[in-house]
From Swiss-Prot:
It comes from Colletotrichum lindemuthianum (Bean anthracnose fungus). GO terms for biological process: autophagosome assembly; autophagy of mitochondrion; piecemeal microautophagy of the nucleus; protein transport; regulation of autophagy; response to starvation; reticulophagy. This is Serine/threonine-protein kinase ATG1. PANTHER family: NON-SPECIFIC SERINE_THREONINE PROTEIN KINASE, SERINE/THREONINE-PROTEIN KINASE UNC-51-RELATED. ATP binds at residues 31-39, 54. CDD domains: STKc_ATG1_ULK_like. The active site is at 168 (proton acceptor). Residues 339-455, 501-577 are annotated as: Disordered.
Amino acid sequence: MADRLPTSTSSGRRRRDGDASIGEFVIGGEIGKGSFAQVYSGHHKNSKAAVAIKSVEMGRLNNKLRENLYGEIQILKTLRHPHIVALHDCVESATHINLVMEYCELGDLSFFIKKRDRHGTNAATEDMARKYPVTPGSGLHEVVTRHFLQQLASALKFLREKNYVHRDVKPQNLLLLPSPGFRKENSRPILTASNDSLIPNAGLASLPMLKLADFGFARVLPSTSLADTLCGSPLYMAPEILRYERYDAKADLWSVGTVLYEMITGRPPFRARNHVELLRKIEATEDKVKYPKDAVVSKDLVKLIGKLLTRNPVERMRFEDFFNDPVVVGPIPGVVEDDIPKVEQKPSRDLRSLEADPQREQSELAKSPRERPLRSPQLPSPDEVRVPQANVSARTGQSPGREIGEGLGIRRPPMPQPSTSAPSRPHRLSNASLNRPPIRASASPPTSYLNERKLRPVTERSMTEQDKAAQDVAFERDYVVVEKKHVEVNAFADEMAANPRLTSLSPKNGQMVRRATQQGPPTSTTGAGRMQPSSAVQIAQGKGRPGHDHPCVSLASRSLNTSSAARAPLRPCTTRSPRIRHRHPLLLLDSSVTADRAHHLTKMHGSSSSSKTSHIVVIVYMALPKSSLSNFSLWHLPWITPWVAPLPTKSMRMVLLSRQRWLCLRRLSCFTSRL
């Protein structure tokens, strides 16, 4: 065991003759003295790292103080925080207990405040004094005050998370170290308890670092518990302690308020010769803290100090509010540019992964734009982007998918050929449409499209067949006139009547596969997918599958031939379909019209019809099973889709056509099966 530590006088002689040692540490000169202990500087024998050694004489302690000392040792062993003085080792002898702790070169906050006018003469504080000079008649600069407050709050928050109450927060127990930058270049190495022990957790890295010390009166005290021990320094005691009342952890907040007041003004808020006089002065203020005339204090600090120095602990600021106060967590105003914390730009996750895997980067670059992952760039608002239709048509005629997809980093399928007879108006690009995930475009509601997508797969066809069908669809565009709510279709029935191949189609395999198209006009720049020709269009254009009969179509053709309307003889359809002289509008009715009412209108108009231009209500979904009613709409007519896409879909249930076209649709099984 080590012998009794020397006094300051003998320590000087010991340094000349050979320093005393305690375990692995060498004792130096005295740097502080308290009621029951002396504090010496020291260093580690091997690393020469500086330490502070607190030597307590056991003979001067009563049982209560001895219990407090052992309690302090147990608490310090469990605490590891950048703003709490760490305990390295504890060496006990017959007469002394020696606590080896972190070394704080600048002393305590009380000394720092008293010597504030001489900060410019100390190399460790010279830069701080130049940037944040002290105002005459006031305390520390507000930037320095807020800096120390944030670090003290960080330490107290750590204690509250462990249900500790310090009970002796005062400037004498707040120790200071030079800033990390100064220590790195000038100071001798300091023995640390952890890797981040000397890295500030709050405040500014360019200013001195604060650490909370002296846990002799600390104890475990949950937020719902009370204590009744009279302890701490009277000038910084909470009034409930001075009144010998039971108190909770909020007593530390009162002490924080007194320390904050002393930092900003240079003196304690209340001074007296004894406890009674001190309590009387506190009661006399009635929670209205007075400041010296020369003190420079911001409104935020005045407000915070008022909340902390509230006599009634119930009305006093809570710890949660204190830790979230803008003064504690917010940026410090008035900081010089050199001290503003630099925000490190960290690479994104994708960039880090590509840097770690060069092969993946090469593979990503090798991918085509269609295969690359979707990224959403920052795009202007919809009002800022207007694309004239003429320009869109010119681009989409070349390679719209590649041009738009590569230019904006968006994966797009090939777009359909634009219509030359579509309404000539500009279309806007929106962030929503450009940032939309790469899916098959659908002009119907999303829910309906998802349900149908699960029920049937989309048939893949070769590009040659797609091009031919797209040309045929382009021929049909010439016979469609778009008016707000009326769409006129003329070519479909004539193609059926004029094409003899329709008689060889099978009713079992004849089905119309719903094609996914993007909502919007045919020249929309939102990246609608290229429409593959549907079965119905192929049937209409004479592209049915050979070897399959379709008696319904044959019946429709015969009914067309026997109708009162004069018809051209059946002939192969090798070119574009003939123009129809009479226009028969396709009317979209509201879904509120019942099936019975529509059937009645069908009979009424059918019996009174004597001309080709008479209109008959056709309920397209009458021949469908109930399970298909919610999914069927005019979107199943692929040549209509580009023209009715901007219209609401829920009202598209009933169609007004001439009798001939109604018979064709009614008898064409591809509209009534496996939709």
